[in-house]
């Protein structure tokens, strides 16, 4: 059995250049042995489990939908706002929600304390993301990283902040 304790999973802080997007993540699946840089299914887990914390006034990332990935969320603490095709809804500790492929969404924190949740993603090999607000695509190019295109390759945060 592979086992980790959250206290020993490294926390990684990420922030966009303009500061609109910020989060701290703990990649639990990576701590359990998933190779985040491999496309080899033997080195990947069938799903990813990540603990995410969004500070007050920030969003996780731009409004987007995945071409292949499904994501299941479970709110642990704080309050968050979830934007989807129907508008914006508040979520609180204990709430669970799901987005399948093609369902655009964005998670934000408009509260006064961190908004913390688990996300479980089914980790498909060749996912892509579409960003409706900026009409961009993130596509994989035989690597674990995405390239961002809008007719031609562009910066991830262009027209997002």
What are these regions (language model features)?
Residues 51-55, 65-83, 121-124:
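Short, conserved beta-strand element in jelly-roll/cupin
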Residues 101-127:
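Ligand-binding loop in jelly-roll beta-barrel domains
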Residues 31-36, 50-66, 101:
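Conserved short histidine dyad/triad with adjacent acidic residue
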Residues 86-101:
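Short acidic-glycine-tyrosine-enriched beta hairpin
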Residues 70, 77-79, 86, 102-104, ...:
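A generic structural motif
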Residues 38-43, 61-66, 108-110:
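Short histidine-centered beta-strand/loop micro-motifs
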